[in-house]
């Protein structure tokens, strides 16, 4: 399939091109029989003469190009309405009735706060052209009225509050929130791209009024957005990873936020607690799913020798050789597991069992990844000394 993308260097365009290139070069093998043979990219820097050639050869058109922040409102018509007319004329002149996706905007409804919007009017006119073209030629028109968009590569301080908030908070810059209660309808860029790829195979989501839609959107307030972003920004300090359900706005916003991090923030130090036996470092904490840590034991060292009422843990040795021993505190039987980083094994530390881990090497350190079902609370540690050896 030969695909023409106008506005290829814009926010949506860059993400769509990246996704289609993955299909084209075989990196994305999840798309069944969908084949991309050529991507014809057209943007404001392109030679206008190339558009006619692309329109003659295209099997599918994504018309994403447009103007949304001009210095002169007259540019809305030129960049949105007139360019659409030029594109459709080139297709019709070539006798090419391939499907055409038009990226319009919710502002084209011209209702509510969008009443009288010059941008919305120019997009509305482009919609009319597209539907008329489809009726006249029999070509398939897929007109999407996109809501506010967010995701990686969106330009900050331009046309997206989310992009600006992410950029500023990631770079320790102030933000301005006029009213935290203002609610936005947002579509995540990856959800939008999934819909675009579905449209390539005839799987678009179409509404009763003839418009197409991105089926997954999120309704959130400015206050909710900024609260989440400040929580994300604090994570390297608190170590607390926020809960992010699959498909949730929080999960998508966190991915977006991370894409704005400056290089100096990509890595951050952890607190290493060192003693004569080795070290212990907390890695990640969660609100309801415990915490992850890494424990380093020096050669020949035994750690642990304690038990818990309700807390339980998983030990996974990732480097070295260890003997993990545990005993129910009211019994004499000792359960032993010899484990190695060469064959990682998860060993559960059971509630009511005192346990220890011994570094069996005389020369090498033992490195153990540990997960506990709850975060450590110094006021209620639920940790009590007792040696595993029942003779002691």
Residue ranges and their predicted role:
Residues 1-26:
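N-terminal Rossmann NAD(P)H-binding glycine-rich loop of SDR-like oxidoreductase domains
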Residues 44-86, 90-94, 107-114:
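NAD(P)H-binding glycine-rich loop region in Rossmannoid oxidoreductase-like domains
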Residues 85-127, 134-137, 142-144:
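Conserved Rossmann-fold NAD(P)-dependent oxidoreductase catalytic core, especially the SDR/UDP-sugar
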Residues 128-156, 167, 173-179, 211:
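Conserved beta-loop-beta element that borders a ligand/cofactor-binding pocket
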Residues 156-164, 181-201, 222-227:
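Substrate-positioning beta->alpha
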Residues 191, 198-271:
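Mid/C-terminal beta-alpha module of Rossmann-like enzyme folds, strongest
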Residues 266-305:
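A short glycine-rich, His/Asp/Glu-containing loop-to-beta-strand
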Residues 328-352:
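Short acidic-glycine-tyrosine-enriched beta hairpin
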